[in-house]
Amino acid sequence: MGHNGNSYYIGIDLNDSYAMVSFFQQNMKEPETVSTVAGSEEFQIPLVLARRKSIGKWYYGDEARRLSKSGEMVCIDRLLKRALNSEKIVIDDDSFMAEELLALFLKKVMELPSKLGNPSSFDRLVICVDRLTKENVSMFYGMAVRLGINSRQLTVIDRKESFYYFALNQDKSLWLHDVVMFMQEKESIFFYSLKRDLRTTPQVVSIDESISYTLDKNDKDKSFLDIINESFKNQIISTVFLVGDTFAEGWMKQSVALLCKGRRVFMGNNLFTKGACYAAATRDREAEWPFVYMGENEMKFNLSLKVHDKGELSFYNLISAGSNWFESKGQCEVIISGSYEVDFWKQLPKSREAKIETLRLTDMPPRPDRATRIRITATPVSDDRIDIEIKDLGFGEIFMSSGKVWHYEMTM
């Protein structure tokens, strides 16, 4: 599918208990979240699979949970944790890897929007999880083929990044100042504050996360009021988002009055699945996006080479600040002119100045000028460290490669 008004995106919010799925097209006002029950506002799909013992048919979600109460079904839950632990699950005489079953569950969830008459294929799938690790990112990308897509169609983000995409895809009046979110997770309340640096182009966006708070069960309203007062110190806030079942229980009186004082307040549990859809759509039009997100998983500096291309001097960007270091990789082939040295340009997104770091290719066999081609590969190993590999490719059949490879770890 092309990246036009008909481009189609899927966003899944996933944890070890449930999934939520939304879909989005550029001609829609906002993403739409899908329920397994037509007309229902119950969007959480339990992360459960069940299989009938006598036959190989699989059920998922609420239906799997309901059917598992009969003795004819085998029920499997906590699939995300089991998949990350590479568990093997045995049912009757069959054995399955948990990752395989998680992919089966996700495939069924991904098919839900198509049952509403939407396309069966899509441009991009974004999966949102609580936190990113090298292990879960690697697992999801390894799962792409089972999901019927290629890895270029898949993106994995965490909840903070989903909040970033959700908030900044709203009407501009909602993010004139800071945007904040209170999120309930079991007994804890977490506070997130999104700030934009107006001095930079593009604007650098950061999200601060507070320590967790606990509501006093005897007086939730007063307890939340205290949390709000503590969290809102020294901030001008345009909009507040409330995510979690507890906020819909009807106990907010004084606290909601304070929240709404000069601010817009929204409540709902499907923010992260909608944010995942916005992430998918935004990444297909990144050139128009006036922000760069600097979270804990995002690269902290730009890494470039200065090259001559068709007679013009230009910068070739290997790694971009704000790109997720789990996913980023840069590679190019260049012909060396002059000495056997490569200059790397390092720049912070908030700075106009660049640092130049020169790597000398020691023990390179002598050749005429412009008769050596090298391949440069830049692979981040964290959000502020990049492994540089430079490989001598020789020069066609005239000068064979020496086979030499140079490694260096680069920091800002």
Give residue ranges: language-model regions.
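Acidic low-complexity intrinsically disordered segments
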Residues: 288-412
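Glycine-rich phosphate-binding loop plus the immediately following alpha-helix
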Residues: 19, 44-54, 68-73, 196-228, ...
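Glycine-rich phosphate-binding loops at beta-strand->alpha-helix junctions
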Residues: 126-137, 230-256
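Early-domain small/polar-rich strand-loop-helix modules and first-structured segments
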Residues: 1-88, 155, 361, 366-412
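Conserved phosphate-binding catalytic cores of ATP/NTP-utilizing and phosphoryl-transfer enzymes
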Residues: 1-10, 150-180, 271-292, 367-368
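Conserved phosphate-binding loops in N-terminal lobes of ATP-dependent enzymes
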Residues: 35-128, 211-225
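A short acidic Gly-Thr/Ser loop motif
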Residues: 5, 11-18, 173-190, 195-196, ...
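Small-residue (GG/TT-enriched) beta-loop-alpha framework at ligand/catalytic clefts
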Residues: 127, 135, 142-224
